[in-house]
């Protein structure tokens, strides 16, 4: 039986999905993170705005009376000096994937290996987004994570039956920020971001590292988010959409 379902989202006008014998709830948890999503992302990396959800917009969204919860994802690109174990993991992954890599991707790997630093998709996440993560292994608590002493790391081959870990819980991750700050974090777990809230552009050689929202702002001094994810109270979807249209989209037509 094939079922056609139209899902209205702010980030796009309409998504029509064909679902056949599929666990839609599991799909939704990974790929459709919230009822509404706002950002200033574009189809091309060169023209995108990773800081489109400003503090002013966050303030407006946080006051929406019909929303159940609103979460934020912050992004910056950092670099990380690879420990021997991480380098070995990436050497194994490169050998496995090189036949499928483009010449450009192979060049990126050679440069990564030569200077022994890997690109980091560094994400700050609020509690509402933390609750959306897809965990590999034991889940940590928000109360522990929000202390700012820990990071959550992504893992490779995330959509396969045997994903590959970059780090193990209990290991130390040394972060050297682009602004000169340094801090040692404990790795508290491995988790995958919902697809729609993750870094949206094609990339091959990188790791994803997450810290709580407050820690991200403290270390990077960036208060503007990449994404806002809003869940409406039951039966209040229309009211939330009207609130967003009137108070956010009317003032900034770059937000989708």
What does each model-identified segment do?
Residues 1-23:
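Short, strongly hydrophobic transmembrane alpha-helices
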């Amino acid at each position: 039986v094939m079922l056609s379902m139209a899902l209205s989202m702010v980030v796009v006008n309409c998504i029509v999905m064909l679902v056949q014998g599929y666990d839609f709830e599991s799909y939704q948890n990974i790929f459709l993170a919230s009822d509404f999503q706002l950002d200033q992302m574009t189809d091309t990396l060169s023209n995108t705005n990773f800081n489109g959800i400003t503090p002013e917009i966050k303030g407006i969204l946080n006051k929406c009376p019909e929303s159940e919860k609103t979460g934020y994802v912050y992004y910056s690109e950092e670099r990380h000096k690879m420990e021997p174990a991480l380098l070995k993991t990436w050497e194994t992954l490169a050998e496995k994937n090189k036949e499928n890599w483009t010449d450009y991707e192979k060049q990126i790997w050679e440069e990564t290996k030569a200077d022994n630093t890997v690109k980091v998709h560094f994400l700050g996440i609020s509690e509402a987004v933390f609750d959306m993560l897809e965990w590999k292994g034991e889940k940590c608590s928000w109360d522990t994570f929000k202390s700012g002493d820990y990071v959550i790391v992504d893992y490779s081959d995330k959509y396969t039956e045997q994903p590959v870990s970059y780090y193990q819980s209990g290991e130390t991750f040394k972060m050297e920020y682009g602004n000169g700050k340094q801090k040692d974090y404990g790795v508290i777990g491995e988790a995958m971001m919902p697809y729609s809230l993750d870094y949206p552009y094609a990339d091959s050689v990188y790791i994803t590292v997450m810290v709580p929202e407050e820690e991200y702002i403290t270390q990077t001094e960036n208060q503007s988010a990449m994404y806002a994810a809003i869940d409406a109270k039951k039966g209040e979807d229309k009211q939330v959409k009207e609130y967003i249209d009137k108070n956010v989209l009317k003032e900034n037509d770059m937000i989708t």
